[in-house]
């Protein structure tokens, strides 16, 4: 179990991610071609990143609330592309995805803050993922969200470097 001060720092990190994301992307209008550049063919564009982050707030919250409310629930692993196709997030206006990310993240924070110490240790099962199958605690999902945010924020920072802006 993480120490309470660590929980608080991670909560602050999760709560501030919408501000950091918006600050990194400030000044790019929805029609700006920067949203659809793909400097690395194996990774997301900026448009896809913000849509993906908004989508996964929902995925993470569903998993966390099910683990909180049910006894060892199973969650079937889903492909990122399938979720994006269902939500339309990879083609959505970036401003809409950013607003959805902010709204869903800010809805997540009070749920996480309200968890009792014993609830953080509750687990659910991931089924059908080649790497991440098995029991996963709420606390592990909590840390995963912060890591997931950090991974994509780092990608955005790379994409926006002057060397990547040249085509």
Question: Model features per residue range: what roles?
Answer:
Residues 1-14:
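Terminal targeting/low-complexity segments that flank the catalytic cores of oxidoreductases
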Residues 9, 33-37, 92-98:
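Short helix-to-loop capping/linker segments positioned immediately adjacent to catalytic or ligand/cofactor-binding
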Residues 11, 15, 50, 54, ...:
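Short amphipathic alpha-helical segments with heptad-repeat character
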Residues 13-17, 23-26, 83-122:
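Acidic/histidine-rich alpha-helical segments that form the ligand environment
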Residues 16-21, 25-35, 39-41:
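Long, hydrophobic N-terminal alpha-helical segment
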Residues 20-27, 59, 63, 70, ...:
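Amphipathic, soluble alpha-helical interaction motifs
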Residues 33-84, 123-167:
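Short, contiguous alpha-helical
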């Amino acid at each position: 179990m993480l120490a309470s001060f660590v929980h608080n720092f991670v909560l602050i990190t999760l709560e501030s991610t919408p501000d950091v994301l918006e600050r990194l992307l400030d000044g790019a209008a929805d029609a700006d071609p920067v949203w659809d550049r793909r400097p690395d063919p194996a990774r997301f564009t900026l448009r896809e990143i913000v849509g993906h982050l908004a989508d996964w707030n929902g995925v993470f919250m569903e998993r966390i609330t099910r683990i909180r409310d049910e006894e060892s629930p199973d969650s079937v692993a889903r492909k990122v592309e399938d979720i994006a196709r269902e939500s339309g997030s990879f083609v959505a206006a970036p401003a809409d995805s950013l607003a959805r990310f902010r709204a869903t993240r800010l809805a997540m924070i009070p749920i996480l803050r309200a968890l009792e110490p014993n609830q953080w240790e509750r687990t659910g099962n991931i089924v059908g993922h080649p790497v991440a199958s098995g029991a996963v605690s709420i606390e592990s999902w909590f840390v995963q969200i912060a890591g997931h945010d950090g991974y994509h924020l780092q990608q955005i920072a790379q994409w926006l470097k002057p060397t990547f802006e040249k085509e």
